Curated annotation (Swiss-Prot):
Binding site for ATP: A20, M21, S22, G23, G24, V25, D26, S27, L46, G138
Cystine crosslinks: C114-C210
Taxonomy of the source species: Bacteria, Pseudomonadati, Pseudomonadota, Alphaproteobacteria, Hyphomicrobiales
Gene encoding the protein: mnmA
GO molecular function, one term: tRNA binding
Location within or outside the cell: Cytoplasm
InterPro entries documented for this protein: MnmA-like, MnmA-like_C, MnmA-like_central, MnmA-like_central_sf, Rossmann-like_a/b/a_fold
The name this protein goes by in its record: tRNA-specific 2-thiouridylase MnmA
Amino acid sequence: MFLNSLDLPGPPENSRVVVAMSGGVDSSVVAGLLKREGYDVVGITLQLYDHGAATHRAGACCAGQDIEDARRVAETLRIPYYVLDYESRFREAVIDPFAESYARGETPIPCVACNQTVKFADLLVTARELGADALATGHYIRSVSYGTHRALFRPLDSERDQSYFLFATTQEQIDYLRFPLGNLPKARVREIAKEMGLTVADKHDSQDICFVPQGKYSDVIAKLRPEASNPGDIVHINGQILGQHSGIINYTVGQRRGIGVATGEALYVIFLDVENARVIVGPREMLETHKLFLRDVNWLGDERLENFPSDCIDVAAKIRSTRPPRPARLYYKEGIFSVDLLEGESSVAPGQACVFYNESGDGARVLGGGFITHSERSTDAEERLQRVLHN
């Protein structure tokens, strides 16, 4: 059977593809490339929020100015284009859980929630209702036929690797999604945009937290969860009260700058005692860990969970989007996933993601991932922390 460039049967003109257009250069080039190949392209932008200053700031996404940019691109490419109002859904699925997570002392990743719900669940349903054979986005990740399904791999441009934010994508979604930029470097994408005469060719890249005006996430959380702004003590791991803070939402585990106390000692946020509104600080070595425990794991590997090895699987793990995967061992026992980081890690915060790969190289396959519930410190560090928490 003849397959086109998207691994769909038949020539491109027989395939309808919905492109999720954010108004940025990446999704615009995706629409342009598919149109140039002859696909029946439909552009859709989800209006996710309208946050005043955020609608025109550099790096915003899916707000007022971005919608106008996407509309101009669609006009240039001569493709049908629609804007869908998803503000209520976005708040329910992304913004509210983001605020709740911070109020619990976690460090959430809203982009994962957005991809998991609004973009790859709700928009996928809309694409199917429009009779589309695939939904294409401008993410930098590769999707490759793998047996009877498709699998996700790190992109050619490792500096733009977005696989960390896509670990929660289900197998059903992966089979329907396409990522045409997976084999292109970012510089080439901008060149293509200029060749096509797209007005967004030099537009700034979007920021991670698109709905936060001026990057002040604490302002958003304070409005939605005012209790997270309650003042409390800043406490040294030795039990000494060092000062006061103006809300745990201003802190995250591993933070060093802006703690608000000066002791002559390099101090880091070790733990957020939400129940007692306390920020626990201490030396860097208190943050070191080799073991993580996870929740809400999305497993994309070949092994069925009921046949998961009784000991472990050798993987590469990534706990920050900007770092390459590092050697690790993955365990699954009694319904719980845990990870041993062979090289260790520091400043691991609850709520962050841990993503698994089959290897640490640039072309590694994504095996899934989950959210960190807690990490296991050294025995001494854990005992010292527990003494402070129970005082």
